[in-house]
Amino acid sequence: MPRDREYDQWGYSGTRRDGGGRYGYRDRSRDERDRFRDVRDRDRDRDRDRERDRGGYRQDPRDRRYSRSRERERRGSGSRDRSRDRSRDRSRDAHRPPPSGRPHQPSGHDSTKSSNSMSETSSTSQVTGTTPNTTNATPSQAEIDAKKAAKLAKVAEWKRKKELERSKSASASPAPSTAPASPKAGFSMSGLSGLRKATDQGQVKRKMFFGGDSDEEDAGRKPAKLLKKLGEKEGSGKSEGKGRGGSQSEAKNASEKNGAASEPAEVDPLDAYMSSLTLPTTTSVSIADSTPLENLNVWEQVDTLEKSQDPTLDLSALSKRKEIAIVDHSKQVYEDFRRQFYVESSELADMTEAETNELRLSLDGIKIRGKDCPKPISKWTQLGLPGPTMGVLNDLRYDKPTSIQAQAIPAVMSGRDVISVAKTGSGKTLAFLLPMLRHIKHRVGVETHTTTLSGASSHPLGVIITPTRELCVQIYRDLRPFLAALELTAVCAYGGSPIKDQIAALKKGTHIIVCTPGRMIDLLAANQGRVLSLSRVTFLVIDEADRMFDMGFEPQVLKLTQSIRPDRQTVLFSATFPKKMEQLARRVLSKRSSDSLGPIEIIVGARSVVASEITQFVEVFQNEKSKFPRLLEVLGKYFAQGFFDEQSEGRVGTGESAATPIPNPKCLIFVERQESADSLLKELIQSGYPCLSIHGGKEQADRDQAISDFKSGLVSVLIATSVAARGLDVKGLGLVVNWDSPNHMEDYVHRVGRTGRAGQKGTALTFLLSDQERLAAEISRAIKSSGNAPPAPVQLMTERFEFKVRSGTEKRHMYGFSGKGLERLQDERDATREHERRAYEGDEAGEAETESSTPAASTANTDIIPKPVIVVTPPDSKSPTTAYHTTLQINDFPQQARYRASSNTSVSRVIANTGCSITAKGEYYPPGRIPGPKDEPKLFILIEGTSERAVKLAHHELSELLVSGLVKGARYQV
């Protein structure tokens, strides 16, 4: 119904009481409703504001006129009102008298005006010699002045008492020397005459106390303001300390000034209290008195430069360094432990010396070096092992011991230090696990406090050290069945996995730890050595000992062995053990004065020999492209038949091969570089072969998963670098392919030893290029050591190489086990240190005194990189993007620096910034090696761009990345 008719029905339309006509009452009623609504809304808005101030504002569902957009505008307008209120309050506060105890601080636009007025007032007072007129002051101002005077009197009285107490304490102490004190670099709050004005390292360290960079900036700003005030009062001509009279005269002068000046300068009680305190002094070390960098070694140079850049590193440097505390064994009290657990059976005791030699000859020609070596066994029952251990051996179907087990287990159980060398796949792991378990089980039973895994039992009794992570995991898996039967525990610790999980496992308690050297050092250095201790270790095993030293682990291994008690039992196992490595490995053997027999060396077969169960093939190719079609042909035959064998020119020997098909056959392909592994993986996947790859550039979780999938049969082809050449045992692995030939004989033996294990047949195929004569000579040595003749093409390449060596055109570079990891280790360190020394010599003396957060390596050390030479590409270039190009040599820099400059992340960022094309080319050459005329050049980065400016910019950014990696590359990585 229309609104007018509604009013007519109620009788409001016919009366003209106010002269408004027909709609007069309606208008009046509407005005009343609007007035009521305004009042209601005002009250509601007031309630809403109250709720909002309390933090509990919530939209009223009954308020239909609520709108989020209008509410947002209302709040926004409120912020503008608050801004206007602040400006209004600021102008009001400018004319308000200062509060008691605080001098007036003019702010903003009126600072100039107030300062001018103050200067005029003070000058007038000085000229006339009279006080300013204060008769016009209001009563409130007079009250404020009276309060100020009373407060100053209290301050003067308080200071007088403090000075009296100080004089009493000074009289009780010895009288100081009458000689004037020299200014100190450090300072206290009671005396400031010795303060330095110049910026030095002392002031840099002082920032740690007085803030500026900390979160509590107000707390740091307060002492700074206090220093400024006290410095103005003290002056340079006054002495540091004041007596009682000085304090009273100072208070008197302050009170007189307060009565004479219109703006009295008074002392706040908090400031006065702070002035009585003495902050800890710091000693400033000048740059001139510090030790020059050239007198320090590389590691001290890096630490010194980093500390000068950031003073906070002084506090945390010790906690970040992975150092193991040196143990003084002469001051330690160790408990005696039992070593002898082997009792010769009557059956072996009745054997004569001739029968013993005949038995050793039948067991793959065992050779013994050492005194009083036990006789080899022929059955497990002759060892006297515990019942649970025998049960596990029966469950695993280990019918009888292998050659190395028959001789090594009795020797180790006799308590002797043993060096064992045996071919791959001969059961070396079980040869040291069984004696270790027998040794530790006895100690757990004897030591009552180790029966429960708590307290001191978190420290292991036995340690197994391996060179690679994959071997560490495999030994731990072989150990687990025996742990459950004997009620023992073990922890597997290796790099690439979270260390917190391994620390948690150690805290629960462990008897055996299987580890890599780097992670063991991490655990020993964690929490200042409170996480793990090797003081209770009495049985030490180093598996693949030769590779441990060859990979450069000698310093780490020596550190670990130094932390273990010297009368321990040490056992070394490996498949290859050159005499030079043997001399170095003997350094870790224990030197017991009570043991005059010395260690026992057991050699099964030759020192570096390929097992007779492996059929070897070596094929020579003219170029790299012809290798992949041959690989596809071999894989096709292998997976179709279950084995691979053919009468070809590259076959080694004429013996029988693996003619029996293998169920679920698997193939392992070895490459030399990580890039080769990734590229070959893509090509095989495109050809229809599902495969995986592992190398040192992958995460440890990915490597573990790849090996697990390969063992379970999810994939049949695995591509790997030499990280899988040691200890990897896979059932059904019947074919090993060396896509890239190994560079030394021992690596070849370990690679092909992944097949033909535990008496099974296997095949090994090696690809050689026609110009790889040096590698052919190494493979020829390995084949001859196994009692076979190398193929004719390989023998021809070997003869050519020997002729070049005799004529002097080639040098016989010995790789790997003849000194790769040890003889060149010091040369590589010296070369790295030389680069770092040159890098840090570029800094000027004045630059060390400046405060900078930029690393030194990225600011002034780019002088070691030559200036870019921009070359213009000929006009007939294939692409216009390569009109200009230059090169950046990275071969001679440390590995960390090379990685920083050539990683995908760094290259992508430089490409995005400059638009240049960046490619890594060449081949890495170790220090001291020079590429020949036909060899690839040293490793470098090719930079190509459309303009000279872009190429220079890309070269500059890559140079900074390269040099910034020197500091990290100089750090000791474990």
Curated annotation (Swiss-Prot):
Motif extent (DEAD box): 543-546
Record's signal peptide: none
Keyword field: ATP-binding, Helicase, Hydrolase, mRNA processing, mRNA splicing, Nucleotide-binding, Nucleus
UniProt cross-references to CDD domains, sorted A to Z: KH-I_PRP5_like (cd22474), SF2_C_DEAD (cd18787)
Record field: compositional bias (Polar residues): 851-862
Helicase ATP-binding domain segment(s): 409-595
Keyword Hydrolase: yes
EC annotation from Swiss-Prot or TrEMBL: 3.6.4.13
Pfam families from the UniProt entry: DEAD, Helicase_C
Low complexity biased stretches: 113-142, 169-185
Chain segments carrying region Disordered: 1-267, 815-867
Domain of life: Eukaryota
Domain notes for this protein: The Q motif is unique to and characteristic of the DEAD box family of RNA helicases and controls ATP binding and hydrolysis.
PANTHER family: ATP-DEPENDENT RNA HELICASE DBP3
Family of the protein in this entry: Belongs to the DEAD box helicase family. DDX46/PRP5 subfamily.
Protein name as it appears in the record: Pre-mRNA-processing ATP-dependent RNA helicase PRP5
Taxonomic source organism: Yarrowia lipolytica (strain CLIB 122 / E 150)
Gene transcribed to yield this protein: PRP5
